[in-house]
Every structure is written in C-alpha cells, then in structure tokens.
Design a protein with these regions (language model features):
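Hydrophobic alpha-helical transmembrane segments of multi-pass inner membrane proteins, especially
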Residues: 1-120, 166-197, 201-222, 251, ...
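Transmembrane helix boundary and interhelical junction motifs in multipass membrane proteins
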Residues: 45-50, 141-144, 155-157, 174, ...
C-alpha cells in the first residue's frame, strides 16, 4: 500500500491532483486491503478486519485525499451504522437480520452482550459483566497489587485492563492511558519529521493499528464498544501480538535514528558552506 501511494504521488504533483485521481488512489489502496479482508471474513475474524480498516483509513487520510470524497464516505458509514442499530433494536429486526440477511448468531450475541451485558450475566455475557464489576470495584485508587476478588475468565488476555483497574483503580487506568498517549505522541513526532514517504506511510499504518487496539480494547471492557477479541498492546498475553508491536516500534526507532542522521548531515553541510564562504571572504573573492 505504501509503495502504491508513493508511486502515485511521484507521478502526480499536488497541483495536478483531481477528485478523479484521488478516487483511483483509494481504489489502488483498497485493492491491497480487500483480499486481506476476504481472508479474515472466511475466518470469521471481525475484530482483525476492523484493525485493517483502521489502517486503511489512516493511510487514506495521510495520502492527502480530498475531503470532498472522505466526508461523504464517513457520513454514509455513520448513517449505515445508525440504520443497522435501529433495525437491530426494532421489533422483529433481529429475526430479519438473522433469517433474511444471514447474520451469524455469534455476531448478534456480541451486540446483545454490548447493549445489555447484565441481562445475560449468567450466560453469554458473564465475562463482560464481571469485567465491568471489577473495574467499578477498583474505585479511585484500587484494591492493591495482585488483589482480584472477582472471577473473570481468561482475564490475562483481552480483559487485562480489568486487572489494572481493579488493582490500581481509576488513577492506575488513567496513568496507563497517559502512557499510551505519550507513546503515540512520540511516534507521531518521529513520523512527521521523516523525509522518507515510504516509511511515513508504513509508520502511519502502525500508529493507526496501535491506536485502534487501545481504543477498542479499553472501550470493550468498559462497555462502550462491543467485545471483538482485540488485545491491549504490550500488556495482553499473546506472542504474535507482542512480536508485531515490537516490529512496529523497531521501525519507528529506525526512523528516529535516520531523522537524527539526516539533521546532523544538514548541520555539517551548513557548517561546511559557512567555512567555504568565510574562506572566500578572507581571500577577497566575495
């Protein structure tokens, strides 16, 4: 995707870009994204599909696509989500979605668990309900390190934030969010300072992936968003997740090093130019 955008920008100057060219750029990016989404659809992995959609959105935004295209698409998606929820909550809506449109039962159960977690607390929403109770029981300062009074299945995975909130309370959860914000801020600074377009788009995709993971995981365990099985970066148990996150951090550190090297070369070039000018001035040439 990054190579496709860089190739497009090299062939199209900023002043020559039109809505038609921006639309074809989106199609090029989508051509790389849709096959991955298709594979994830076969695996019924909706959470990871949302992650790739977040990466797709971030790359499209930074590529400079006109808001005349982005805004209508965003409004259409927002309207579609609102319409879906209206149908889902209406009388006979769930039957229509399941029997007519073929919506899987497990997806409907996840939405029900999100909308009414305590109505099914003894069956399919036991984990979500217990997680929200654990967060609430933490209070302001928490119950203390390694103190977990509530049983939450597999809490070391997607529900790890409930442990932090229960043990360290609101203050501990807020500190974790501030650390994530600081990390994202540093990554954005590195990305914006980079002169390499290819690296810029790759790092943007990684940042969007990380931000979505944080937003979705904490939003899901607190009941703001549906539970989709997205891990909390650098904290949740999972080998592949931590490896991919560390690869992304390594990329950002490499970009930071290259930025410093580039700045040092520019300083050396300016100093050399100043010395050459001073020598010419001493010889009376200028």
């Amino acid at each position: 995707v990054s190579r496709a955008i860089v190739h497009f920008l090299r062939n199209n100057r900023e002043e020559d870009r039109t809505l038609k060219k921006d639309f074809f750029l989106i199609l090029q990016i989508a051509a790389y994204t849709i096959p991955v989404l298709g594979l994830l659809a076969f695996q019924h992995d909706f959470g990871t599909s949302l992650v790739f959609m977040a990466i797709f959105s971030g790359v499209v935004l930074i590529s400079g696509v006109s808001w005349k295209i982005i805004l209508p698409v965003f409004l259409t998606l927002a309207g579609g989500i609102a319409l879906f929820l209206a149908v889902f909550l209406s009388d006979g809506g769930r039957a229509f979605l399941h029997q007519t449109l073929g919506m899987p039962t497990y997806q409907m159960n996840r939405i029900l668990a999100w909308l009414n977690p305590f109505d099914y607390a003894q069956t399919m929403t036991f984990q979500q309900a217990q997680g929200q109770l654990a967060i609430a029981s933490g209070g302001l300062l928490g119950q203390g390190f390694n103190v977990s009074n509530l049983l939450i299945p597999v809490r070391e995975s997607d529900m790890i934030f409930t442990v932090i909130a229960e043990d360290f309370g609101f203050v501990g959860g807020l500190c974790l969010l501030l650390l994530y914000m600081f990390l994202v801020y540093k990554m954005l600074r590195i990305t914006l300072k980079s002169n390499n377009q290819f690296y810029t788009y790759i790092s943007t995709g990684f940042i969007m992936m990380l931000v979505f993971h944080i937003f979705e995981n904490i939003g899901a365990v607190t009941g703001i968003l549906p539970l989709t099985g997205i891990p909390l970066p650098f904290i949740s148990q999972g080998g592949s997740a931590i490896v991919s996150n560390l690869i992304g951090i390594g990329l950002l550190l490499s970009m930071s090093h290259q930025n410093r090297v580039s700045e040092e070369r520019k300083k050396e070039s300016r100093l050399l130019r100043q010395k050459q000018l001073s020598r010419l001035h001493e010889k009376g040439i200028i």
